[in-house]
C-alpha cells in the first residue's frame, strides 16, 4: 500500500467523490474534480518527461490551483518547489535554477516577471 500524498488523496476521492476537497473564497472543488484536474496536469507533466524525483516550481498564491498543481507533481513522483511570491527576478532565477526545477507553475499576475534568463531543462513548461 502506497502512503504518498497522491495515493491517499486518490483513495479519498474514490470514497467521497462529491464532498468538498478545496474551498478558496467562492470556489469549491470536489474530491472528484480535484483528482481529475491534478491527473490531467500530471499527464501533461509525464508527457513532457517529468517523473520520479523531478522538481517543479510553484510560483502561485495560496489557492486551489496551488494545491491542484502540487498534487499533480506528487502524482508523477516529483518534488514541488515552493517559490515565495515576494522574490524578485534575481532570487527567482537563483531558486529555480539551483533547485533543478524542470517546470514552473505561476499565476498570471506573475507573468510580467522575465524568464529570459531562466535555463530550465524543460523550458516549454514555464
Model-derived features: positions:
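A short N-terminal helical cap/helix-turn-helix that marks the beginning
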Residues: 1-20
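Conserved AMP-binding/adenylate-forming core of the ANL superfamily
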Residues: 18-71, 88-93, 97
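Anion (oxyanion) recognition and catalysis
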Residues: 74
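Structured binding elements
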Residues: 77
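Conserved ATP-dependent adenylate/AMP-binding module captured primarily in the ANL superfamily
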Residues: 87-114
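Single conserved hydrophobic/aromatic residue that forms the stacking wall/gate
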Residues: 117-126
